[in-house]
Structure formats: C-alpha cells, structure tokens
Amino acid sequence: MDDDVLTTLKILIIGESGVGKSSLLLRFTDDTFDPELAATIGVDFKVKTIAIDGNRAKLAIWDTAGQERFRTLTPSYYRGAQGVILVYDVTKRDTFTKLENWLNELETYCTRNDLVKMLVGNKIDKDNREVDRNEGLKFARKHSMLFIEASAKTRDGVQCAFEELVEKILQTPGLWESSIQNHGVQLSDNEPQRQGACGGYCSLV
C-alpha cells in the first residue's frame, strides 16, 4: 500500500477515434510515442503516481475506443470519474465539431456534476491545422473546461495537461477522498494559484 499517496483519482480520456488519446496516455505514463499505434479495442487502463504541490496522487487513467461499436462500455467507463480529458485533432475539424456529442454523453453517464474537464487540442506538431487555437479556447470557455494544445509526438503540453487537471481536482472540495489518515491536506485556499508548468498555456476558462 502506498501510505504516502494522498488519494487515487479516476481520469478518463475521450474523443473521436484517431485523435491520439492512446498516444497522449503513453507519452504521459511511459514517455513513449509510436506513430503506428493501433486503434484501442475496448478500454485500456494505466496507473501513474504524480506529485502536485507536495501531495502524491495515484491516477487510474482510462483510455477508451472512439468507435461507435464500443459504446456499450460507456456506463461503467464513466462511473465515478473525477476528471476527464476531452481530445480533438487540430488537423481534423470533424473531431472538433463532434465534441458536443462527447459532452452530451459525459453529461448522460457521469455520476458526478463537479468533475473537472480538460480540453486538449492534439497534434500541434503537424502543419495542416484546421482548428485555430482560439476556437478551442472559445469552446472550452463555453463549457467551463481547462484548455491546452499539445503534441504526443513532441511531448509539448502533455505533462501539463494531466498535472493541471489533477491540481484542479485536488482544489475541488468533495470531489475526492483522502487515502491518508490523520495527516491533513497541504492545500490552502489562501495560497495563490500557481500558473502551472505550461507557462500560461493552460487555463480554467
């Protein structure tokens, strides 16, 4: 048992097939990138422990297939999640326009109203961009989401996306339970919020 782990959090990664959900997960957990990575079949699952403001949190990260034929997995996949990363491909506009569908699904199946949402525009290393950064930012603002652009290939923004999501979860009262007995939590409402490792890229809007 990890006695010094503050809490275990369930994080989901959702979005259309081919947007790079699995690549973002593997870059974050294993620091690897495979350009020939096959599409996820069903659900993949990885665990990683990170430190946020002196507190260690264990992340149980669920990566699901974007294809319609796997939608029967949906209810159990969403149950109990505290955070969700919603991914689109900045080079494919249709993956951006379908974000509303994913948000509707999230609202239908998620068991928490206060879960933290992060919008990630992936594949910014490519030249053929179809979705402007300001469009992503505007969408995130509309739906009260954190926002960042990233590249699983080059690492840009990946670590920040997960760290900022977890930090926001830990700052949300009642969203998580402490695994440490009688130790208290080293998070203070009086402390100024740090800008984050992304240097202003990532913001709650």
From Swiss-Prot:
Keywords: Cell membrane, Developmental protein, Endoplasmic reticulum, Golgi apparatus, GTP-binding, Hydrolase, Lipid droplet, Lipoprotein, Magnesium, Membrane, Metal-binding, Methylation, Nucleotide-binding, Palmitate, Prenylation, Protein transport, Transport. Its main location: endoplasmic reticulum. Switch 1, switch 2 and the interswitch regions are characteristic of Rab GTPases and mediate the interactions with Rab downstream effectors. The switch regions undergo conformational changes upon nucleotide binding which drive interaction with specific sets of effector proteins, with most effectors only binding to GTP-bound Rab. GTP binds at S17, G20, K21, S22, S23, D34, P35, T40, G66, K123, D125, A152. The small GTPases Rab are key regulators of intracellular membrane trafficking, from the formation of transport vesicles to their fusion with membranes. Rabs cycle between an inactive GDP-bound form and an active GTP-bound form that is able to recruit to membranes different sets of downstream effectors directly responsible for vesicle formation, movement, tethering and fusion. Required for the localization of ZFYVE1 to lipid droplets and for its function in mediating the formation of endoplasmic reticulum-lipid droplets (ER-LD) contacts. The gene is rab18b. It comes from the Eukaryota. This is Ras-related protein Rab-18-B. GO terms for cellular component: apical plasma membrane; cis-Golgi network membrane; endomembrane system; endoplasmic reticulum membrane; Golgi apparatus; lipid droplet. A motif (Switch 2) lies at residues 63-80. The keyword GTP-binding applies. A lipid is attached at C198 (S-palmitoyl cysteine). It holds the Pfam family Ras. It is an enzyme of class 3 (hydrolase). Disruption phenotype: The most common abnormalities observed at 3 days post-fertilization are microphthalmia, microcephaly, pericardial edema, delayed jaw formation, a reduced overall body size, and a general developmental delay. Further characterization revealed that the rab18b morphants have delayed retinal development and abnormal retinal lamination, residual nucleated lens fiber cells, widely open choroid fissure, and microphthalmia at day 3. A motif (Switch 1) lies at residues 31-45. The keyword Nucleotide-binding applies. The lineage of its organism: Eukaryota, Metazoa, Chordata, Craniata, Vertebrata. Residues 203-205 form a propeptide. GO terms for biological process: brain development; chordate embryonic development; eye development; intracellular protein transport; lipid droplet organization. Its cofactor is Mg(2+). It is found in: Endoplasmic reticulum membrane; Golgi apparatus, cis-Golgi network membrane; Lipid droplet; Apical cell membrane. Transmembrane segments: none annotated.
